[in-house]
Amino acid sequence: MPPTESTAHLRTIVVPTDGSHASLQAVALACDIARKNKGQVYVLHVIEVKRTLPLDAQLEMEEAVGDEILARAEEVARRQGFQVETEILHAREAAPAIVDEAVAREADLIVLGMGYQRALGEHQLGRVVPYALENAPCEVWVCRHPAEE
């Protein structure tokens, strides 16, 4: 299927993942768009490093978890016949790291997957979504997973 006019310019796509079902669905969506547009998908996992540690601290357990998460994202892409590039980032906060990576890669789109989150009766966006919507120079799509019954 050829790209539509509204998505044909979306060739470089960044997708952060925490391994959640919603973020893996975002990977699948990004792969679908990039395949149609002959583009590339960069899947990121951000390890938030405490301020008491240096950014390059050896966080073996977090790295192992990140590797597993990125392997699942690669499997999602593989099932769609697509290959993604993956990277683990170390940062103090995930949101600025994601936007900075999108800028560095000259991304056309950031796809954010988020689960259905409610706290105190209100829907919560977390920290990444508002930051990306406010600061990313490219398009940002937020794909919210439906509430579980």
Language model feature labels by segment:
Residues P2-E60, V76-R78, F82-E85, N135:
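Small/aliphatic-rich secondary-structure junction motif
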Residues A57-V65, Q124:
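Alpha-helix N-cap and loop-to-helix initiation/capping positions
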